[in-house]
């Protein structure tokens, strides 16, 4: 007995990374189940809702974080599975079957990551209430709950919505807030986009990240890997799994299976740790300044002498302070920084290995292979094949 062929509408703005991954998850279920579905989604991946009720087909999977979509589907008589953020109050969920990203778990993952790094001061950069982003309010609520439970003092700044006409003003206000935070504060941003705003403001203020402030975002948005000088740590949402679960649930509904209203929470995939939370508990201002200089210039072929010139103290003095604070020599830190930059580029980009070798200041590809294999007991190519973030 063959399943009836169904026409299914996907209502997502899949030009955004999160929505796109949800749609990919739907596709993965179709491939795995071999369901006979004809999928309708706008050609430019925008969720247009004009005359929506005339072309919904046999079932819908929709972005219920979008209030306009949720309202228009309120009295539609076809099976619907909503996808969106979780709520801490059960009564706030929409009255449809619902697959939710676990907002509390997302923030908790970021919080625990910072704690594991030795951070004990925390701040949250969210979105203003005027943005009408329920998931942002839920993440802020989760942050407040977590710091209260752990007896930490948490600072929250919602900031301003950003648009071209107010961008500089919003960044100036963000900079004002950042300057009120004590050193060694870990900032959890509500999204990677907001985290990138923090990194940009820190660069303009000459606040070293992660030496003085740590920053972690949520989404693991691929574009942010390239748009900020400091590589951003982030919590990867289970968006593909959400799409898969939504399609699986819709399949059951199309088969007229009787079931109570479903609420399925999908946890985050994992924390992707990058430079922005590579925190060491440093207290010596000269060492902090030197570490920041090394991180920004190691791949330009700097020697110990350039670090000394940047900090302005003698070699014996700085070497002694490095040994006390870091347990390494200045030269060893320059070497380690170059290698870490190369490792990061291997797993986060598709750049040719020879180009990475040149970018990181190695005199030849052969020498880079030798140094890399000595540290990681594998070749750069083998390491990329095993650890590439493109697999996420």
Predicted regions and their residues:
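Residues within the helices of the helix-turn-helix
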Residues: 305, 331, 354, 370, ...
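A secondary-structure capping/hinge motif
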Residues: 322-329, 371-383
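Short helix/strand-capping hinge loops at secondary-structure junctions
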Residues: 297-302, 329-330, 379
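Alpha-helix N-cap/start motif
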Residues: 209-210, 315, 330, 353, ...
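Bacterial carbohydrate/catabolite-sensing allosteric modules
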Residues: 1-59, 69-310, 319, 324, ...
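Recognition helix of helix-turn-helix DNA-binding domains
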Residues: 312, 328-332, 363
